[in-house]
Structures are given as structure tokens and as C-alpha cells.
């Protein structure tokens, strides 16, 4: 039974802060149509059944108390699409008693062949579109989220009139409650580059993108929610992925799946603590940085696109990713160096646009390192013991 009887929003928020997160985006409503917030537009909510509490509202207070940004995700616009197959089998979707929960689930398998992504699914009725607009606006009015994450169906042509209205309402309303306008996450071609932030689900980009973007993925290798006998990404995988994304002007939104009782699996907490420990030492190479003229160097490449993040090869000591902040350049080595020297080819004395190096520091190590900027690269002498288990960030000035 879903009761979330052990849900502790304060503990959750503290864990997220300790992990190094800067913003938290819980699911306000997923494709099942169940609102995890205090909605006045539905009886199928966490306030009126199950946990019998405003999960989103309670978490919003706790997250903001930790100094983090708070957002929400809504997947309601896909609701009648995901549940449409229920029309073809004996299921609760066909029971009029649950019509308010399942909505006008449309049997598109029988009645229409889906058109290519972002074209018009004509069965998205104006009534369903207006319902999405009302519920999305309700989230804005109740919780003033800094981020609104939407799944891909907001890109359907039949939804766009409501999307335009929502974006104007959200951006204008958010300015009343904060110093800056909120952000909308979109997928594919639902919005323009300058109007919102592109999101790639379980994927990355192969090159620097001039506009900010985001990867959303799950710490689980198999699922977005909690399942038994799950397997999880390692701290090294998460850190390497984060570094690669940031070097290309992106952010990482990492999903975790809590149990139905409101607790977060210990294995997940351990990964988050490890990532947070790395960021406590190396965070200056991540937070508030911008890409360099190239994202990095090395043999390991990442293909652009969604739904392939677990296909990435293991990074080596020859793989570096670059970030900048002011006059400081950071080179993050994704594999542990095997000897007493590491070489960054992009910073050779003859390379076009390469910096003239005055000092090199390994974050987490006192003092500066000896280096030689030569025609074949920047040669850095390493300490006898290189601390840490994961990526190694060099501060270069």
C-alpha cells in the first residue's frame, strides 16, 4: 500500500543538499493521473488518500529551507495516451466509477496510427488540453516552482496554444515571487532555444551546446521508480556523467525512486553521499562554470541523443573535460593517472587558443604542482599519492 508513512521531507532535503544538488524536482503528477499535491481539481490526490499529506508542499518547504531551488514535474498531458491501451482490455480504465482518475483515455491503437513525434495527435482534445493548462497553472499558483519540467507531449501541435499561454503565465507569475523568472524544461522541439531549457532523457550531447541544456536520468539502471532487486549507477559513473555534461554547457537532473513507505533505499543514499563528498572537494570546477572552447580531449566519446546513457564506455586517464570560471581553467581527468605525470594535449605551448599557464593545482591537494608546457602538451608532475577514487580536477591559471 502506498502510504508514505515514513516520508521525512526534512531528511530528504538534507540528503539532497549533502549530495551537492542545487535544485530538486519531484514528480507532482506522473502518467497515472495521481496528484502528489493538494489539488483542488481532483479527488485522486496524496492529500485525500494514501499518504494523506501534501507531499509536494511539504518537500517544497524542506528543500527551500536547505537553500535549494525547488521545481515540479508534470506528465499529465500524456495521461490519456499512456492509458489508452486500457480501453482494449478488461481494466479499470473502462469503469465509469474511475473516469475522473483515468480521464478520457483514448484507444489510439484502434482509432489512429500515431504520427511522427511533435506532429499533431488529433485526439488531444481541447478539453484535455485545457485541463492540462488548469492543473499546470494550479501548481504554479500553489507552490511557485523555480522549474517546471514537462515530458515530450507538450510539443504536439494541438497542445501548443495552451503551452504558449502557460509559458506566459508562468514566467510572469514567477517574477512576482522571486528575483528571476522560472525555467521550463522541454524535450525535442517543443519550444525555442531562447524560451526554455532543452532536456534529454537518459542521454547526453556529443558537443558543446551554446544554450543551456539538461540531462535527466535515473540513478537506477532499470527504472524510474522503486523496484525490488534493482541495480544502480556507481558514484564514478554519476560523477563522470556530470563532468561530461557540465563541460558541454549542461546540467544533470538525477532521479531516485523511493519506496512506497517514503524511505530512500540505502544503496541510493550511499551513491548520493559519495557524489556529494567529491563535490565538496571539486565543486569549484562544476558550479557556476562555463565551457571552454572545446569540451575536452581523449579517446572516449559520447553520442548525442536520448535513451543511451548506460552505453557510455569507461573513461580513461587520457580523457579530460574542461570548464572555465573567470580567468581560471579547470581540466578534469576522468580516469586515475597510473604514473607520476599526466599530460593534457590541448594545452600544449603551440596549440591555437591554449592558455599560457602560470600555475597548476590539484583540487584537494595543498600547494601547486610542477608543470612544463611543451609543444606536445601540458606535462603535470603528480604527487606520490593522488587522493580520491574518482575524477581529478586541476585548477589552471
Give each language-model segment a name.
Residues 1-397:
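Mature catalytic domains of secreted/periplasmic carbohydrate-active enzymes
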